[in-house]
């Protein structure tokens, strides 16, 4: 039921986003209907799934230590790191291969909050990190500084990207609903977000299963494109 609620909320936001682009604010970390720079494409998608484990255990994999330790993303290993894991100022960098060459992606932690309830460079900044007593969490990060144009050799270019990963403890003690949302402005196809995020949720279940913590029912990850629009 909670997963359906999360899905419906996201779909409703997508429906609202059909407003005339010229009347919308520029895209930012604020999750709302928005417009991209002229000549680029706006993409808004969310990957959903249920992991059969308590949110606290899911958070250990996808949240609280997931700046430098990315085992849930297929063993992705940073090529370099700076600072302390998941602490403001920490930086992780990756060497990725595009269709026509290599490029470097760096992601930086900016803010962490707790709640009691060709070579190119692409920098992302963690803008929000919230947790609740039941283990639910919300992690948000964005391309930073003010979105530069980042060329991916042979694939296109980033003109801004924003991500939110929500892990919500359900009424079932050992089940966590996941909503992994990405909205971005780009030309071409910079990154297969749907495939990557679905794999990340699946891998998290696999890691927890190896740890003997996957005791509930998991629902396979799936992605809904809320909106794709040329601006």
From Swiss-Prot:
Residues modified by glycosylation: 44, 95, 174, 203
Keywords: Glycoprotein, Signal
Consequence of gene loss (knockout): Abolishes the production of azasperpyranone A.
Domain of life of the source: Eukaryota
Signal peptide: 1-19
Biotechnology remark: Azasperpyranones display potential anti-cancer activities. Azasperpyranones A, C, D, and F exhibit potent growth-inhibitory activity against the A549, HepG2, HCT-116, and HL-60 cell lines, with IC(50) values of 2.39-14.42 mm, respectively. Moreover, azasperpyranone D significantly inhibits HCT-116 xenograft tumor growth in BALB/c-nu mice. In addition, azasperpyranones A and C can bind with four kinds of therapeutic targets for cancer, eEF2K, FGFR, survivin, and TNF-a.
Induction behaviour: Expression is induced by the azasperpyranone cluster A-specific transcription factor ATEG_03638 which is itself regulated by the azasperpyranone transcriptional regulator ATEG_07667.
Pathway(s): Secondary metabolite biosynthesis
Function: Part of the cluster A that mediates the biosynthesis of azasperpyranones, members of the azaphilone family that exhibit anti-cancer activities. Azasperpyranones are synthesized by 2 clusters, A and B. Cluster A is responsible for the production of the polyhydric phenol moiety while the azaphilonoid scaffold is produced by the cluster B. The non-reducing polyketide synthase ATEG_03629 produces 5-methyl orsellinic acid, which is then reduced to 5-methyl orsellinic aldehyde by the NRPS-like protein ATEG_03630.
Protein name: Azasperpyranone A biosynthesis cluster A protein ATEG_03636
Record organism: Aspergillus terreus (strain NIH 2624 / FGSC A1156)
Lineage: Eukaryota, Fungi, Dikarya, Ascomycota, Pezizomycotina
